[in-house]
Amino acid sequence: MSNVFQNTSTVTVLQGDYKVTTDPKVVFSTVLGSCIAACIYDEQVGVGGMNHFLLASSAGSGGVSARYGVHAMELLINGIMKKGALRSNLKAKVFGGAKMSANLSDIGANNADFVQRFLRDEGIPVISSSVGGTSARRVRFHACSGAAQQTHVADDRRLGEEERAAVARTQAAPARKPAAADNVTLF
């Protein structure tokens, strides 16, 4: 499986983003602390994607943003299915959810619990997961085959500081109203 990572182009998935591809030459990459990356794929069709969400849900009502778990998951699943995936073929790999700071509530554990519950409720099997702990991870995901690589990030103090700042901004930002282009068909 490691051969699928050779001779590929890397596409970075940032916080609050998701990417989907059918191109076997593309590998998605992200760095996670307390955030979660769900890697969902249909290896029979050769399509998959990765999201990267910051919080399981918004503190206020109406937080429609890919920064939040439910919306991020719906965007990813819908994006994969629009590229031809069959729902019955979907599989998932889940990463992240670390406790990055003693000063934060255990956002990572909440995120990990959310994504596991969401995938179970949607009937999408989690083939593998690496969640929790206290260190950041770098994840690479070959979406067409479902192959994934994870390495722990040695010096993750800066990532913890960045996550604290991102959480504070997210909690302080008013929820935006979705534009027509943001409408998603939920299933």
Swiss-Prot record:
It comes from the Bacteria. It is an enzyme of class 3 (hydrolase). Coiled coil: none annotated. One of its GO terms (biological process) is chemotaxis. SUPFAM superfamilies: CNF1/YfiH-like putative cysteine hydrolases. Pfam families: CheD. It catalyses: L-glutaminyl-[protein] + H2O = L-glutamyl-[protein] + NH4(+). GO terms for molecular function: protein-glutamine glutaminase activity. Its EC number is 3.5.1.44. Keywords: Chemotaxis, Hydrolase, Plasmid. Probably deamidates glutamine residues to glutamate on methyl-accepting chemotaxis receptors (MCPs), playing an important role in chemotaxis. Belongs to the CheD family. HAMAP family: CheD (MF_01440). This is Probable chemoreceptor glutamine deamidase CheD 1. The gene is cheD1.
